[in-house]
Amino acid sequence: MFIASAKLLVAALLTAGCALARAADLYVICNAHVSLRPAEVRDLFLGEKQFAGAVKLVPVDNGAAQTMFLGKVLQMNLAKYSTTWTKKSFRDGLNPPLVAGSDAEALAMVKRTPGACSYVTTLAGVDVVVVSKQ
């Protein structure tokens, strides 16, 4: 079992490197039991990657940062993302990611759910390990 203060892994630090992007950084975070490479983030949130070793992955969308995440990471809009998951649900029997309403809720879900990964716009007060900076 893990404790609530377990370290979160930052699977990717995604910024465009310009002044505007710095005002809206995006961090992909995972539960301490998840080993995920930045290149696997897209596959995770599109249902193509379901396990990291023996750990069942649980993607968690952050409603507050979803538009930014979809544009920067998945390079699609909300309509296309929803359509993708509707098709995947019928075709493959997969459920779309859970949805958190804010950074704080996403962090809490990742801390308490083994296999969970999400994304946030701030890391204030969070003990993390940066795996990659892009």
Kindly label every feature range from the protein language model:
Residues G17-A23:
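Sec/Tat signal peptide C-region and signal peptidase I cleavage site
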